[in-house]
Structure formats: C-alpha cells, structure tokens
Design a protein with these regions (language model features):
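Accessory RNA 3′-end/elbow-binding domains used by RNA modification enzymes
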Residues: 3, 18-21, 55, 60, ...
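RNA pseudouridine synthases
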Residues: 1-167, 243-244
C-alpha cells in the first residue's frame, strides 16, 4: 500500500521514467522468524530466539546504507529462462539468482521493540529502483543472527510524489462524480519543473514535432548559457509543451517526445 502514481493519456510516456525514480518505504520487521516469501504471508521456515540489543540493531541496519548487492527473492516477478520466479517457487523449484546492485540512500530506524513477545523493528528506507524491502529485512535478520521477515510495508514516496498529497480510490471516485478530478491531475510538463523551459521559433515547429535535432537558432526564449548534456522542457511557438530535449554539442537532441499528430 502507499503512493502509486497513475499516468493518463500521453502521460503514459512517463511510466518508464517513473520506474527509475527513488522511493521511500516504511516497513516493520518481525525478528526471529524467516519465511519462504520473506514476509509474514509466507510459510515459516525458521523461528529463533531474539538475543540482540538496540545498539546491535542500529549498527547492523547502518551497514546496509550505500550500494548493496541484493539477491532477488524467489517470490518475485523477475524471469529466469522465460519463467517468472514466483511460478517456479510455487512449483517447489528454487533456482540460482544473480545479485543485483541496489542503493540504500538512507535507512532510519524509527522504533525498536525488544520487550514484547513479538519483537519488531520499524524502519524508513530511501532506495533505488529494484530494491526488495522484504529481502532487505531478511538480510538484516541474517546479520543479526536471529532471522527476520517483513511484517508490513507502506510506500510513502515515489520521486517527488509523497503520501500526504495522495488521494484514495474512494476520494478519486467522489471527485470524478463532482467533475472536479481534473483539478488534481498534474500536467506532464510539471513533472519536469526542475528543467529549464525553452521555446522555439515558429519556423522550427515542424522539426520539433518530428523529433528532429534543433539548432541553437531555433530557440527564441532567453535560456542563458546551455550546459552540455543538460535537459530542457521544449515548447512550440504557440506555448504547447512538446517534449524533453538534451543539449549536446551545440544542438538540442530529443530525449522524450510527448507530442502526437492529434495535437494539431
């Protein structure tokens, strides 16, 4: 559960970019238990006494910050020889998986409960794409020596989208009935607000629509100095957003197009 950006219309062109964004999760680890799925929905594999203190938990968790080679879980949608891993796992087949390099930008321990019968650690993880939080919990448990699995998970951020700004499905349905849903839709170019905005001369509109390279003289807006490999939001002469271009060697090269022929 948690933040899930939804792309509509031409905005579906953002999907491949969104998957590359960093994400933030809040997770609760259950100490002393391991399962085949690495979370509490799976079959219990081991149960061990939890004989660690808070200092050890903090030290071990801090060791996972930075780059980290993570072995994907068997219960995942990754494919090996054309077969999804979870299909193999359900058939009782386990195959070797190659470690994948992920990045844990930060791992904050919010709460450590070692007093109750159910011993838990609550963490907030800021990470790169492709990171399995339940596998992270399992790996932390291994280093602690008692094992662990994920008890709960909530995605609180995807890129610039944070959970405080999200709408529930019920809220979306209610807004749609009132005809107010468009007030909450983020325009495509707003997604690139960190990029500088440039406008082309009308003479170059056709080149722009076709995704051709654009010379410096095509730009009529004052963009200041252009840095090599810098990305820009490019608009046509009428002020409509067309796409993302990258400045390379004195010209602008298409990075991502959001224009189609139906726009004219």
């Amino acid at each position: 559960m948690g933040v899930l950006p939804v792309c509509l219309g031409k905005g579906t062109g953002l999907v491949s970019m969104i998957t590359d964004w960093t994400k933030t999760y809040e997770a609760v680890m259950l100490l002393g238990t391991t399962t085949d799925t690495q979370d509490t929905s799976g079959t219990v594999l081991t149960q061990s006494a939890v004989e660690v203190d808070e200092r050890t938990v903090l030290e071990v968790c801090s060791q996972f910050e930075g780059e980290y080679d993570q072995i994907p879980p068997m219960y995942s949608a990754l494919k090996v020889n054309g077969k999804k891993l979870y299909e193999l796992a359900r058939a009782g087949v386990e195959v070797e998986r190659k470690p994948r390099r992920v990045v844990i930008n930060s791992l904050r321990v919010n709460d450590i409960n070692l007093e109750d019968d159910v011993k838990t650690v609550t963490i907030t993880v800021d990470c790169s794409k492709g990171t399995y939080i339940r596998t992270l919990c399992d790996d932390i448990g291994k280093k602690l020596g008692c094992g662990a699995c994920m008890m709960s998970l909530k995605r609180t951020r995807v890129g610039d989208f944070v959970i405080d700004d999200t709408l529930t499905l019920n809220q979306i349905a209610a807004l749609a009935l009132k005809g107010e849903i468009e007030d909450y839709i983020v325009s495509i170019d707003e997604m690139f607000s960190d990029y500088r905005k440039l406008t082309v001369d009308a003479v170059y509109n056709r080149l722009l629509y076709n995704g051709n390279k654009l010379p410096l003289e095509a730009i009529v807006s004052d963009g200041g100095e252009f840095l090599d490999m810098e990305k820009f939001r490019i608009y046509d002469a009428e002020g409509s957003f067309v796409g993302i271009y990258k400045y390379i060697g004195g010209q602008f090269v298409l990075e991502k197009m959001f224009y189609d022929n139906s726009d004219t």
